[in-house]
């Protein structure tokens, strides 16, 4: 995992200790985010299991268009599969479902309730991840209590077109210089781009189509993990 930023004279007391405890929670480098619409040849559960066989240790269930009961049913299935492979499960947005299925964490968007509100509801039961797209968002999200962030899109990708021009590697580097929590780069990352992203300071990468769009999901996962070492 990327090196932690050293504490400065301007840091509030205890910041370094809190950062270290958060990094211990976030003990993965490859973060798989689901999109069942990318998976044509099998069920989403089967596709995720292939990725877990390949070595993924963290999965975010992100199926925003599902009815609540369908999502809950799918979350229970994902919890069963991820436990089998000793992997972490995060639920997108829905703190209630994350708690109901005993997920490891929740992942928030910029239009979700803030991390501080999640902490009031869930205490320390959930690891809190959050999506960010700029330096200001990253700083505010850390201040609100997130344990880690995704940042991007780093490169152009169909799933992130609404965010406009990708901020790119230089902005990723600036974000890493300003926050102390782990940062996962997201957006258009292919295996030959991983080194550039990690050299910019990313603690890991988050992938959707990069894994789920592959013909051999388990092998594609292994390819990413090999270059992440």
Segments (PLM) and residue ranges:
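Short, electropositive alpha-helical surface patch
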Residues: 201-210
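Short, structured segments at the rim of ligand-binding sites
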Residues: 6
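Active-site helix-to-loop segments that bind/position phosphate- or nucleotide-bearing substrates
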Residues: 197
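A short acidic, helix-capping loop that chelates divalent metal ions and anchors anionic groups
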Residues: 98, 155-161
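Conserved N-terminal beta1-alpha1 strand-loop-helix module at the mouth
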Residues: 2, 21-113, 119-147, 164, ...
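Short Gly/Ser/Thr- and charged-rich N-terminal loops/segments
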Residues: 10-17
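Glycine-rich adenosine-cofactor-binding loop
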Residues: 168, 185-190
């Amino acid at each position: 995992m990327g090196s932690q930023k050293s504490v400065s004279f301007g840091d509030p007391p205890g910041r370094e200790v809190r950062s270290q405890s958060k990094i211990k929670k976030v003990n993965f480098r490859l973060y798989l985010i689901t999109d069942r619409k990318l998976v044509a040849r099998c069920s989403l559960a089967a596709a995720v299991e292939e990725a877990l066989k390949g070595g993924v240790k963290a999965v975010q269930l992100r199926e925003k268009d599902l009815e609540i009961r369908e999502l809950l049913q799918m979350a229970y299935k994902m919890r069963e599969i991820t436990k089998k492979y000793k992997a972490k499960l995060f639920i997108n947005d829905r703190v209630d479902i994350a708690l109901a299925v005993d997920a490891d964490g929740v992942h928030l968007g910029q239009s979700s309730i803030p991390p501080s509100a999640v902490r009031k509801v869930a205490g320390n039961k959930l690891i809190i991840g959050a999506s960010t797209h700029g330096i200001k968002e990253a700083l505010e999200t850390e201040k609100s209590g997130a344990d880690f962030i995704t940042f991007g899109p780093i490169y152009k990708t169909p799933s992130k077109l609404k965010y406009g021009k990708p901020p790119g590697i230089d902005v990723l580097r600036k974000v890493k210089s300003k926050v102390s929590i782990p940062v996962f780069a997201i957006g258009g990352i292919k295996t030959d781009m991983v080194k550039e992203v990690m050299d910019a300071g990313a603690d890991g990468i988050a992938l959707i189509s990069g894994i789920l769009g592959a013909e051999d999901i388990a092998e594609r996962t292994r390819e990413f993990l090999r270059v992440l070492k």
